From Swiss-Prot:
Main location as per UniProt: membrane
GO biological process: heme O biosynthetic process
Record key words, sorted: Cell inner membrane, Cell membrane, Heme biosynthesis, Membrane, Transferase, Transmembrane, Transmembrane helix
Reaction catalyzed: heme b + (2E,6E)-farnesyl diphosphate + H2O = Fe(II)-heme o + diphosphate
UniProt keyword annotation of Chaperone present: no
Membrane-crossing residue ranges in chain numbering: 8-28, 35-55, 74-94, 106-125, 132-152, 162-182, 208-228, 233-253, 264-284
Protein name: Protoheme IX farnesyltransferase
Gene from which the chain derives: cyoE
HAMAP family: CyoE_CtaB (MF_00154)
Pathway, per record: Porphyrin-containing compound metabolism; heme O biosynthesis; heme O from protoheme: step 1/1
Top EC group: transferase
One term of GO molecular function: protoheme IX farnesyltransferase activity
Enzyme Commission code(s) on record: 2.5.1.141
Length: 295
Protein backbone atom coordinates (compact mmCIF):
# COMPACT_ATOMS: atom_id res chain seq x y z
CA UNK A 1 0.00 0.00 0.00
CA UNK A 2 2.86 2.39 0.81
CA UNK A 3 4.26 1.78 -2.66
CA UNK A 4 0.98 2.86 -4.27
CA UNK A 5 0.81 6.05 -2.19
CA UNK A 6 4.37 6.84 -3.26
CA UNK A 7 3.72 6.09 -6.93
CA UNK A 8 0.68 8.38 -7.12
CA UNK A 9 2.89 11.36 -6.15
CA UNK A 10 5.05 10.81 -9.28
CA UNK A 11 8.50 10.59 -7.58
CA UNK A 12 10.31 11.21 -10.87
CA UNK A 13 8.61 14.58 -11.27
CA UNK A 14 9.35 15.47 -7.63
CA UNK A 15 13.03 14.61 -8.10
CA UNK A 16 13.28 16.67 -11.28
CA UNK A 17 11.70 19.65 -9.56
CA UNK A 18 14.04 19.31 -6.58
CA UNK A 19 17.05 19.71 -8.87
CA UNK A 20 15.69 23.04 -10.08
CA UNK A 21 14.78 24.12 -6.53
CA UNK A 22 18.36 23.44 -5.45
CA UNK A 23 19.65 25.41 -8.44
CA UNK A 24 17.54 28.45 -7.58
CA UNK A 25 18.28 28.22 -3.85
CA UNK A 26 22.06 27.93 -4.22
CA UNK A 27 22.16 30.63 -6.90
CA UNK A 28 20.56 33.03 -4.43
CA UNK A 29 22.62 31.77 -1.47
CA UNK A 30 25.92 32.58 -3.22
CA UNK A 31 27.94 30.23 -1.06
CA UNK A 32 26.32 31.17 2.25
CA UNK A 33 23.87 28.33 2.80
CA UNK A 34 21.25 28.39 5.54
CA UNK A 35 20.84 24.63 5.94
CA UNK A 36 17.61 24.62 7.98
CA UNK A 37 16.06 26.97 5.39
CA UNK A 38 17.41 24.72 2.63
CA UNK A 39 15.78 21.65 4.20
CA UNK A 40 12.43 23.36 4.85
CA UNK A 41 12.36 24.64 1.27
CA UNK A 42 13.18 21.26 -0.28
CA UNK A 43 10.67 19.33 1.81
CA UNK A 44 8.00 22.02 1.45
CA UNK A 45 8.27 22.16 -2.33
CA UNK A 46 8.39 18.34 -2.52
CA UNK A 47 5.12 18.07 -0.61
CA UNK A 48 3.40 20.73 -2.71
CA UNK A 49 4.55 19.10 -5.96
CA UNK A 50 3.45 15.71 -4.64
CA UNK A 51 0.05 17.15 -3.79
CA UNK A 52 -0.33 18.65 -7.26
CA UNK A 53 0.60 15.34 -8.86
CA UNK A 54 -1.95 13.40 -6.81
CA UNK A 55 -4.68 15.92 -7.69
CA UNK A 56 -3.61 15.65 -11.34
CA UNK A 57 -3.86 11.85 -11.19
CA UNK A 58 -7.35 12.19 -9.72
CA UNK A 59 -8.48 14.66 -12.39
CA UNK A 60 -6.92 12.75 -15.29
CA UNK A 61 -8.00 9.24 -14.35
CA UNK A 62 -10.55 9.14 -17.18
CA UNK A 63 -8.10 10.10 -19.94
CA UNK A 64 -5.28 8.09 -18.36
CA UNK A 65 -7.28 4.95 -19.19
CA UNK A 66 -6.99 5.80 -22.89
CA UNK A 67 -3.23 6.33 -22.96
CA UNK A 68 -0.70 3.52 -23.18
CA UNK A 69 1.76 5.44 -21.01
CA UNK A 70 -0.69 6.05 -18.17
CA UNK A 71 -3.16 3.15 -18.28
CA UNK A 72 -1.43 1.40 -15.37
CA UNK A 73 -1.44 4.32 -12.98
CA UNK A 74 -2.57 3.66 -9.42
CA UNK A 75 -5.94 5.42 -9.63
CA UNK A 76 -6.76 3.95 -13.03
CA UNK A 77 -6.25 0.43 -11.67
CA UNK A 78 -8.23 1.21 -8.53
CA UNK A 79 -5.37 0.53 -6.11
CA UNK A 80 -6.29 3.71 -4.21
CA UNK A 81 -9.85 5.03 -4.00
CA UNK A 82 -10.55 8.45 -5.53
CA UNK A 83 -11.80 9.71 -2.16
CA UNK A 84 -8.61 8.66 -0.37
CA UNK A 85 -6.49 10.25 -3.09
CA UNK A 86 -8.24 13.59 -2.52
CA UNK A 87 -7.66 13.38 1.23
CA UNK A 88 -4.03 12.41 0.65
CA UNK A 89 -3.45 15.23 -1.83
CA UNK A 90 -5.04 17.78 0.50
CA UNK A 91 -2.90 16.72 3.47
CA UNK A 92 0.28 16.83 1.37
CA UNK A 93 -0.57 20.30 0.13
CA UNK A 94 -1.39 21.71 3.57
CA UNK A 95 1.84 20.30 5.01
CA UNK A 96 3.89 21.70 2.13
CA UNK A 97 2.39 25.19 2.28
CA UNK A 98 2.80 25.33 6.06
CA UNK A 99 6.45 24.31 5.84
CA UNK A 100 7.15 27.01 3.27
CA UNK A 101 5.27 29.67 5.28
CA UNK A 102 6.89 28.92 8.65
CA UNK A 103 10.20 27.42 7.51
CA UNK A 104 10.99 29.72 4.59
CA UNK A 105 8.91 32.88 4.11
CA UNK A 106 5.40 33.93 2.99
CA UNK A 107 6.64 34.87 -0.49
CA UNK A 108 7.92 31.34 -1.10
CA UNK A 109 4.60 29.96 0.08
CA UNK A 110 2.53 32.26 -2.14
CA UNK A 111 4.68 31.43 -5.16
CA UNK A 112 3.99 27.77 -4.41
CA UNK A 113 0.27 28.53 -4.15
CA UNK A 114 0.31 30.28 -7.53
CA UNK A 115 2.18 27.41 -9.16
CA UNK A 116 -0.21 24.91 -7.57
CA UNK A 117 -3.34 26.80 -8.65
CA UNK A 118 -2.06 27.14 -12.22
CA UNK A 119 -1.18 23.44 -12.43
CA UNK A 120 -4.23 21.94 -10.73
CA UNK A 121 -6.92 24.56 -11.18
CA UNK A 122 -6.12 26.07 -14.57
CA UNK A 123 -4.07 23.47 -16.45
CA UNK A 124 -5.33 20.10 -15.19
CA UNK A 125 -9.00 21.00 -14.75
CA UNK A 126 -9.47 22.98 -17.96
CA UNK A 127 -6.64 24.02 -20.30
CA UNK A 128 -5.14 20.56 -20.83
CA UNK A 129 -8.45 19.24 -22.17
CA UNK A 130 -9.75 22.28 -24.03
CA UNK A 131 -6.94 24.44 -25.40
CA UNK A 132 -3.83 24.15 -27.54
CA UNK A 133 -2.36 26.74 -25.16
CA UNK A 134 -2.54 24.37 -22.21
CA UNK A 135 1.17 23.61 -22.47
CA UNK A 136 2.01 27.32 -22.35
CA UNK A 137 -0.08 27.88 -19.22
CA UNK A 138 1.28 24.72 -17.62
CA UNK A 139 4.84 25.90 -18.23
CA UNK A 140 4.35 28.64 -15.64
CA UNK A 141 3.67 26.09 -12.91
CA UNK A 142 6.64 24.03 -14.06
CA UNK A 143 8.87 27.07 -13.64
CA UNK A 144 7.72 27.79 -10.09
CA UNK A 145 10.09 25.46 -8.12
CA UNK A 146 13.41 27.20 -8.96
CA UNK A 147 11.79 30.59 -8.33
CA UNK A 148 10.53 29.36 -4.96
CA UNK A 149 14.03 28.14 -4.11
CA UNK A 150 15.51 31.48 -5.10
CA UNK A 151 12.93 33.60 -3.27
CA UNK A 152 13.16 31.44 -0.14
CA UNK A 153 16.64 32.95 0.22
CA UNK A 154 16.12 36.49 -1.08
CA UNK A 155 12.58 37.02 0.24
CA UNK A 156 11.92 39.24 -2.79
CA UNK A 157 10.97 38.74 -6.42
CA UNK A 158 13.81 40.50 -8.22
CA UNK A 159 15.33 40.38 -11.69
CA UNK A 160 17.09 37.11 -10.90
CA UNK A 161 13.76 35.47 -10.04
CA UNK A 162 12.23 36.81 -13.24
CA UNK A 163 15.09 35.40 -15.32
CA UNK A 164 14.68 31.99 -13.67
CA UNK A 165 10.95 32.10 -14.41
CA UNK A 166 11.70 32.85 -18.07
CA UNK A 167 14.39 30.15 -18.40
CA UNK A 168 12.33 27.34 -16.92
CA UNK A 169 9.06 28.38 -18.60
CA UNK A 170 10.69 28.51 -22.02
CA UNK A 171 12.42 25.18 -21.41
CA UNK A 172 9.08 23.51 -20.68
CA UNK A 173 7.74 24.19 -24.17
CA UNK A 174 10.13 22.17 -26.40
CA UNK A 175 10.39 19.58 -23.63
CA UNK A 176 6.61 19.10 -23.58
CA UNK A 177 6.17 19.25 -27.35
CA UNK A 178 8.83 16.57 -27.76
CA UNK A 179 6.84 14.30 -25.43
CA UNK A 180 3.66 15.02 -27.38
CA UNK A 181 5.37 14.06 -30.64
CA UNK A 182 6.80 10.72 -29.54
CA UNK A 183 3.58 10.00 -27.62
CA UNK A 184 1.44 11.36 -30.46
CA UNK A 185 -0.98 8.42 -30.63
CA UNK A 186 -1.57 8.54 -26.87
CA UNK A 187 -2.55 12.21 -26.94
CA UNK A 188 -4.65 11.66 -30.04
CA UNK A 189 -6.48 8.72 -28.46
CA UNK A 190 -7.20 10.74 -25.31
CA UNK A 191 -8.31 13.73 -27.41
CA UNK A 192 -5.86 16.08 -25.70
CA UNK A 193 -5.38 19.21 -27.87
CA UNK A 194 -1.60 19.54 -27.72
CA UNK A 195 0.06 21.48 -30.54
CA UNK A 196 1.44 18.49 -32.52
CA UNK A 197 -2.02 16.89 -32.58
CA UNK A 198 -3.98 20.06 -33.37
CA UNK A 199 -1.62 21.88 -35.73
CA UNK A 200 0.61 19.05 -36.91
CA UNK A 201 4.14 17.91 -36.17
CA UNK A 202 5.72 20.26 -38.73
CA UNK A 203 4.20 23.29 -36.96
CA UNK A 204 5.33 21.89 -33.60
CA UNK A 205 8.89 21.65 -34.94
CA UNK A 206 8.81 25.36 -35.79
CA UNK A 207 7.61 26.19 -32.29
CA UNK A 208 10.26 23.96 -30.74
CA UNK A 209 13.00 25.76 -32.66
CA UNK A 210 11.72 29.22 -31.71
CA UNK A 211 11.32 28.33 -28.05
CA UNK A 212 14.84 26.90 -27.86
CA UNK A 213 16.22 30.13 -29.33
CA UNK A 214 14.26 32.13 -26.74
CA UNK A 215 15.47 29.74 -24.03
CA UNK A 216 19.07 30.27 -25.15
CA UNK A 217 18.71 34.04 -24.83
CA UNK A 218 17.10 33.74 -21.39
CA UNK A 219 19.86 31.46 -20.07
CA UNK A 220 22.51 34.02 -21.00
CA UNK A 221 20.71 36.71 -19.00
CA UNK A 222 21.84 35.17 -15.71
CA UNK A 223 25.46 35.91 -16.61
CA UNK A 224 24.79 39.21 -18.35
CA UNK A 225 22.82 40.30 -15.30
CA UNK A 226 25.66 39.44 -12.97
CA UNK A 227 23.94 36.52 -11.24
CA UNK A 228 26.04 33.66 -12.65
CA UNK A 229 29.66 33.44 -13.78
CA UNK A 230 31.40 32.68 -17.04
CA UNK A 231 31.60 28.93 -16.47
CA UNK A 232 27.82 28.88 -16.31
CA UNK A 233 27.74 31.07 -19.42
CA UNK A 234 29.91 28.64 -21.39
CA UNK A 235 27.81 25.63 -20.36
CA UNK A 236 24.55 27.48 -21.06
CA UNK A 237 25.73 28.51 -24.51
CA UNK A 238 27.03 25.03 -25.35
CA UNK A 239 23.86 23.31 -24.16
CA UNK A 240 21.62 25.74 -26.04
CA UNK A 241 23.56 25.44 -29.30
CA UNK A 242 23.54 21.64 -29.13
CA UNK A 243 19.83 21.52 -28.31
CA UNK A 244 19.07 23.93 -31.15
CA UNK A 245 21.12 21.78 -33.50
CA UNK A 246 19.08 18.74 -32.50
CA UNK A 247 15.88 20.69 -33.13
CA UNK A 248 17.02 21.77 -36.59
CA UNK A 249 17.92 18.19 -37.49
CA UNK A 250 14.28 17.37 -36.85
CA UNK A 251 13.32 19.01 -40.15
CA UNK A 252 15.16 16.21 -41.96
CA UNK A 253 14.34 13.41 -39.53
CA UNK A 254 13.10 10.21 -41.13
CA UNK A 255 11.48 9.08 -37.88
CA UNK A 256 9.87 11.89 -35.89
CA UNK A 257 9.24 9.65 -32.90
CA UNK A 258 12.90 8.71 -32.53
CA UNK A 259 14.02 12.30 -33.06
CA UNK A 260 11.53 13.67 -30.52
CA UNK A 261 12.57 11.14 -27.89
CA UNK A 262 16.22 12.18 -28.30
CA UNK A 263 15.22 15.84 -28.06
CA UNK A 264 13.27 15.08 -24.90
CA UNK A 265 16.16 13.22 -23.28
CA UNK A 266 18.57 16.04 -24.05
CA UNK A 267 16.13 18.59 -22.63
CA UNK A 268 16.56 16.89 -19.26
CA UNK A 269 20.34 16.92 -19.65
CA UNK A 270 20.17 20.61 -20.57
CA UNK A 271 18.11 21.82 -17.62
CA UNK A 272 20.01 19.63 -15.16
CA UNK A 273 23.32 21.04 -16.42
CA UNK A 274 22.09 24.60 -15.99
CA UNK A 275 20.73 23.89 -12.50
CA UNK A 276 24.08 22.43 -11.45
CA UNK A 277 26.10 25.27 -12.96
CA UNK A 278 24.01 28.05 -11.42
CA UNK A 279 24.44 26.25 -8.08
CA UNK A 280 28.24 26.40 -8.20
CA UNK A 281 29.07 29.37 -10.45
CA UNK A 282 27.19 32.24 -8.84
CA UNK A 283 28.07 35.93 -8.60
CA UNK A 284 27.01 38.82 -6.41
CA UNK A 285 25.04 41.17 -8.69
CA UNK A 286 26.70 44.50 -9.41
CA UNK A 287 24.44 47.52 -9.12
CA UNK A 288 25.81 48.64 -12.50
CA UNK A 289 25.20 45.43 -14.41
CA UNK A 290 23.48 45.28 -17.79
CA UNK A 291 20.04 44.34 -16.53
CA UNK A 292 19.94 47.35 -14.22
CA UNK A 293 19.46 49.43 -17.30
CA UNK A 294 17.34 46.97 -19.27
CA UNK A 295 14.81 46.42 -16.53
Amino acid sequence: MIKQYLQVTKPGIIFGNLISVIGGFLLASKGSIDYPLFLFTLVGVSLVVASGCVFNNYIDRDIDRKMERTKNRVLVKGLISPKMSLVYATLLGIAGFMLLWFGANPLAMWLAVMGFVVYVGVYSLYMKRHSVYGTLIGSLSGAAPPVIGYCAVTNEFDTGALILLAIFSLWQMPHSYAIAIFRFKDYQAANIPVLPVVKGISVAKNHITLYIIAFAVATLMLSLGGYAGYKYLVVAAAVSVWWLGMALRGYKAENDKVWARKLFVFSIVAITSLSVMMSVDFMVPDSHNLLTYVW
